[in-house]
A protein has these predicted regions:
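Residue-level preference for the first positions of well-ordered beta-strands
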Residues: 77-79, 151-155
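Conserved H-X4-D acyltransferase segment
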Residues: 6-10, 42-105
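Short gly/ser/thr-rich secondary-structure transition/capping motifs
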Residues: 55-63, 135-136, 190-196
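A transmembrane-helix-recognition feature enriched in membrane-embedded lipid enzymes
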Residues: 1-59, 117-118
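A cross-family acyltransferase "interaction/gating" segment
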Residues: 114-117, 147-153, 162-200
Length: 200
């Protein structure tokens, strides 16, 4: 119970703190400077949220650490394809994966109080799943951002798993990679469902 209260208090508190003390600085920034500034803040936020949950993260590379280092040095845009077990997947990925990246998310999240505003400043892409025409425009925007060198996380299951198992991948999940030629980096999250399942 204590950890749950601490986690949600920090979640709201850090967003409020960011809006008051960090977000105004973005008014004087643009382009890559804005993106890098927000990404650095997000990395600290991710680790703080994992700490608040009482969890520990171990990053295991499957013979790909050198490749990740090369991606960092070359500032290469990649598409991270990850399973989606829990809301805590977001801070885990942001805090512990050694790259700057944003997320491909559903359109509705752009209007969420506090979180939506930070996601927009974080250069997230919002896809309209219900409007195919708008969805195509969103995809074109995403392609341009990837060509600029920005990496993105995609949850190909479309939403969090209801039972901890990997769900069927949605059609079009790999379209960004195929249309841009960006390298795909697979990521497997293990144990986050036990920390915070969809039902909790």
């Amino acid at each position: 119970m204590f950890r749950t209260i601490l986690y949600h208090t920090m979640l709201v508190g850090t967003f409020l703190y960011g809006m008051i003390f960090r977000y105004p600085a973005l008014w004087f920034m643009g382009g890559e400077r804005r993106y890098n500034y927000t990404s650095k803040i997000a990395k600290r936020w991710g680790k703080n949220m994992v700490w608040a949950s009482g969890s520990k993260v171990e990053v295991v590379y499957n013979d790909s650490y050198a490749e990740i280092e090369n991606i960092k040095e070359d500032n290469e845009a990649v598409i991270l394809i990850s399973n989606h077990q829990s809301n805590i997947d977001i801070p885990v990925l942001i805090g512990y994966f050694p790259l700057f990246f944003s997320f491909v998310a559903k359109k509705e999240m752009a209007t969420w109080p506090l979180i939506g505003r930070w996601m927009r400043s974080f250069d997230c892409i919002f896809l309209d799943r219900k409007n195919p025409r708008q969805g195509m425009k969103d995809m074109k925007q995403a392609i341009e951002k990837i060509k600029k060198g920005h990496s993105y996380v995609i949850f190909p299951e479309g939403s969090r798993t209801p039972d901890g198992s990997v769900q069927e991948f949605k059609k079009g999940s790999f379209k960004l990679a195929t249309d841009t030629g960006a390298k795909i980096v697979p990521v497997t999250l293990i144990g986050t469902y036990d920390v915070q399942s969809r039902k909790s």
